[in-house]
């Protein structure tokens, strides 16, 4: 490794279940003392232990990548917000909440196609899934992150889904065709609302808010 950070494996301590703890860790992609953490989600029913190493692929595929502020397993996270790639939805037509829900958007993966460091996370989703062959990469900054979605050249659809799984929220898209704003009301242990501002490096073909918080 060129840097000692290359030896860090953030998946250590994530092989847990209700009968035995092996760390109860959140695989946090973040800089030291970062404002946000970013974590893959394989268990959308939990906002702290949202990633379980031993249940992936056929058992529990990737739901999304989440922004999180989980201080520990025992103190619930807050200010969470999710994004996920998708190739199964035809965004040019009508899009419903059911079409971009956790059940609909989840995509199988294997740990062989996953790179998990504090300074860099990537995963390539299995072909034939709701995000067929898509590679997601996350690089953190002090208050945000750079995200890259690489879609197969022959993908019929290239979508990015936004959500606020564990709280109410809002989502709006800018008139410039590239920027968006979101708010998540997932609060806990004194944590307040979180506001999100993002921008794509190229214009989208179509953007739509579903309900108030998804899109």
Residue ranges of model-derived segments:
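Accessory carbohydrate-recognition regions in carbohydrate-active enzymes
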Residues: 1-215
């Amino acid at each position: 490794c060129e840097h000692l950070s290359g030896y860090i494996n953030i998946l250590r301590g994530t092989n847990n279940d209700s009968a035995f703890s092996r760390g109860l860790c959140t695989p946090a992609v973040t800089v030291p003392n970062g404002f946000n953490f970013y974590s893959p989600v394989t268990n959308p029913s939990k906002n702290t232990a949202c990633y379980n190493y031993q249940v992936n692929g056929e058992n529990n595929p990737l739901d999304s990548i989440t922004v999180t502020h989980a201080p520990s397993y025992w103190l619930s996270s807050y200010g969470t917000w999710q994004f996920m790639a998708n190739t199964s939805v035809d965004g040019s037509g009508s899009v419903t909440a059911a079409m971009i829900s956790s059940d609909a958007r989840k995509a199988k993966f294997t740990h062989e196609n996953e790179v998990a460091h504090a300074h860099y996370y990537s995963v390539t989703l299995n072909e034939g899934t709701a995000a067929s062959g898509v590679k997601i990469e996350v690089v953190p900054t002090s208050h945000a992150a750079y995200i890259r979605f690489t879609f197969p050249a022959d993908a019929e659809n290239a979508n990015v889904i936004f959500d606020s799984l564990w709280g109410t929220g809002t989502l709006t898209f800018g008139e410039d065709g590239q920027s968006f704003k979101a708010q998540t009301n997932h609060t806990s242990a004194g944590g307040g609302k979180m506001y999100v501002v993002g921008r794509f490096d190229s214009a989208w073909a179509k953007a739509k808010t579903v309900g108030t918080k998804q899109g």
